[in-house]
Regions:
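A structural motif detector for beta-strand N-caps
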Residues: 2, 6-10, 14, 20, ...
Length: 55
């Protein structure tokens, strides 16, 4: 289940799938991939996931 705060910035080409929680004022930048298909992923408030990162 995705739980993404409404203040999260999702850049073009980013992908968020599966069991993912993303906190307030977080940036998910260009072509970053966050996959929570094998377990829960938690990204806290005011975090920054840079271009092309894979989590």
């Amino acid at each position: 289940m995705k739980r993404i705060d409404k203040t999260v910035y999702e850049a073009q080409g980013s992908a968020i799938e599966g069991d993912v929680t993303i906190g307030v004022d977080t940036g998910i930048w260009f072509n970053a991939v966050i996959r929570g298909d094998e377990g829960h992923i938690f990204i806290g408030d005011r975090s920054n996931v840079q271009d092309n990162a894979t989590i």
